[in-house]
Amino acid sequence: MKCNTKCDKNGYFGEFGGQYIPEVLKPAVEELKEAYKELKDDEDFQNELAYYLKHYAGRETPLYYAKNLTEKLGGAKIYLKREDLLHGGAHKTNNTIGQALLAKKMGKTRIIAETGAGQHGVGTSMAGALFGLETEIFMGRVDTERQQPNVARMKLLGAKVTPVDTGSKVLKDAVNEAMRNWTATFENTHYLLGTVMGPHPFPTMVRDFQSVIGKEVKKQIMEQEERLPDYLVACIGGGSNAMGLFHPFLSNNISTGNDDAKNVKMIGIEAAGKGLNTSLHGASITKGEKGVLHGMLSYFLQDEDGQIEEAYSISAGLDYPGIGPEHAYLHNLGRVQYASATDKQALKAFMELTRTEGIIPALESSHAIAYAIENAGNMDKDDIMVINLSGRGDKDLNTVINAVHKLGC
């Protein structure tokens, strides 16, 4: 079956996606859709975006051969795409600069965002400061308590941080609150959504801004290995860092020339939390069902009555109970494989990379590293695996120190 990576005019990837929004929000979403349609291919806009990504954010980021980890595991050659080195400490900056610049062009004076781990909140706060936009970040109370360093950074950057005390007080509740705020303020406010979810055009727009990751990897791996990788691996929350890595390798969207992108295996790693046999996980594709939330049709964790269940992960950025619609489509198509890693596996991976390579990964990224630790040793030594190291782990040190002691990792 052909992998069509373009959504239709109504924002559907196959049966997934769409615009499930109240009437009051339709003018805001339509305004955004038309503005993005006009600017995405505008040469001046793209040149300005490229300028800020290079000179402000520090692109391109390195593609690093993890020689020590490769030798220790004894299998596939492991490369790390170093998004942790991007200004702000994670891949989120690619999207926040793009959307904030778009908001500025639309004449908006205020941006709002949801955040879980805090990295998107930090990235949005940075972009707000850069472009002179009033900024408010909605963050679940639970996440504000476990991500204090990022809360402090957001405030330092001039953003208002609003704790959310409804529901389970985590990421999905922050999204709910941000959408409510946008409904009342969209005339002067842009909702800078942080991942490839939500109503059309957000999944496509965020993916496009993040695709710089995969475009660079494609060029860099050809320079270093003279061929494409065998495996691309990324963690999955809502799924933006993974879509950013995967999308340029989906064969109908690139001019492949002599390289054979259709043979590149793509693997997304969800949060298995305390185990997939428990209710404490965030594995929406592995354990979820089709449903509608936050303006889109996708896979969500639900109870028998179709009510959204709480997601759990030791990583604040992976405890969203759903998945972006393009991921749901690629899963159904079989083009991308989805696996999972438990808290304990992620913590072990965090420690392994830190002590083997001297690189401290985010707990989110550690889920992808865990896949390599479990599987790379069984692969051929000529195989090449690229892992998206989506963020740095400074924000997670307190969580890791406490958890490692309890779990004995």
From Swiss-Prot:
Gene Ontology cellular component annotations, sorted alphabetically: cytoplasm
Instruction: Give me the reactions it catalyses.
Output: (1S,2R)-1-C-(indol-3-yl)glycerol 3-phosphate + L-serine = D-glyceraldehyde 3-phosphate + L-tryptophan + H2O
Is Phosphoprotein a UniProt keyword of this protein? no
Q: Into which EC class is this enzyme placed?
A: lyase
Under the GO molecular function aspect, what terms does this record hold?
A: tryptophan synthase activity
Q: What keyword terms does UniProt attach to this protein?
A: Amino-acid biosynthesis, Aromatic amino acid biosynthesis, Lyase, Pyridoxal phosphate, Tryptophan biosynthesis
Enzyme Commission numbers on file: 4.2.1.20
List the Pfam families hit by this protein, alphabetically. PALP
Pathway where this protein functions: Amino-acid biosynthesis; L-tryptophan biosynthesis; L-tryptophan from chorismate: step 5/5
Cofactor(s) listed: pyridoxal 5'-phosphate
- SUPFAM superfamilies for this protein: Tryptophan synthase beta subunit-like PLP-dependent enzymes (SSF53686)
Cysteine pairs bridged by disulfides in the record = none
Residues that bear N6-(pyridoxal phosphate)lysine: K92
Q: Which family does it belong to?
A: Belongs to the TrpB family.
> What is said about its interaction partners and assembly?
Tetramer of two alpha and two beta chains.
Task performed by this protein: The beta subunit is responsible for the synthesis of L-tryptophan from indole and L-serine.
- Protein name, as recorded: Tryptophan synthase beta chain
Q: Give the organism the record lists.
A: Methanococcus voltae
Gene name per UniProt: trpB
